[in-house]
Structures are given as structure tokens and as C-alpha cells.
């Protein structure tokens, strides 16, 4: 089964994808990790690379290309990334939401930065990504119609989210 998991920064996609990968015993691929790897390749931090990518369509197209290439010919895979649902043929497409303050707190704990710094970075990064996605792909990141399931990750613990998704995969398997 191919599953895509997307969500804004700090919404819990990486945590849930890793737990689900272990639970289902299937590999996990992160578009965010591809983006971070490309930033390192260019010698930039995430915010710098995001701004650079905003003026360079080739960056987004390369991320999409790398993701599609790595996902190609897989029978079972979890693909985590904001646009994964648009570029990966999947049996289940999931989007995570969470309040800005919750996402800010999660990133603060993960990266050890101040709340104000993280909140500004989330807002800046979100605007940058929304602009790039609209300009390059014509995708409105706020449009949930492409997703089969939208989960408020603030409402559940990560293990509970993985269990919800697992149950949905069981339902899908029964319908095939």
C-alpha cells in the first residue's frame, strides 16, 4: 500500500510517518529530508534555501522528481511531504493539521529555538511555500479535496494517530 502524509511544519507528519512505518513494516520516504539534503548541497540553511527556491522553479521540480523516482515501482511505501499527494500515486492520501501555537511548541522542543523565532520562521516558511506551490504547480496548499483523510494531530497522541491510519489501511485493504 502506498500512503502519502502531508502537513505544515510542526504538524507531526514525520513522527507519525516513522511510527506508522514501523507498525506496518514498510519503508518511509521524506520529501522534507530531500529538501534539507538539497539545502546542504547548496550550503544554505532551510530559510535561505526556501527563499532561493521561491525564485527557482527547478528546486521544486527537482524535489518532485527525486520523490517520484524514489517512490516509483514500490508496492508498499509511506511518502511524507506537503505535496506528496499530488505527485505520488497513492492508495491513501492524508493531511495533518494542528494549531500554530502547537506547531510552534513542537518545533521549539525539537530545535531548541525561542518561541518567537520559531513562530516567525513557521509563518515565513509557510508563506514562501504557499507562494512556490501556487506559482509552480497551481496548487492551493489549503485545498483539502485531494486528501482521503484529514487529521488534527493536536487531538491525538502520535501512537493514536498511527493506529487511526492503520485502521483506515485495514478498511482500504478489505475494499480492494
Each language-model region and where it sits:
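Small-molecule kinase domains that catalyze NTP-dependent phosphoryl transfer to phosphate-bearing small molecules
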Residues: 115-164
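Post-Walker A helix-loop "phosphate-sensing" segment adjacent to the P-loop in P-loop NTPases
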Residues: 22-29
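ATP-binding Walker
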Residues: 11
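ATP-dependent small-molecule kinase phosphotransfer cores
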Residues: 31-87, 100-101, 112-117, 127
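P-loop (Walker A) phosphate-binding loop of NTP-binding proteins
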Residues: 8
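Hydrophobic anchor at the beta1->P-loop junction of P-loop NTPases
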Residues: 5
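Walker A/P-loop
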Residues: 14
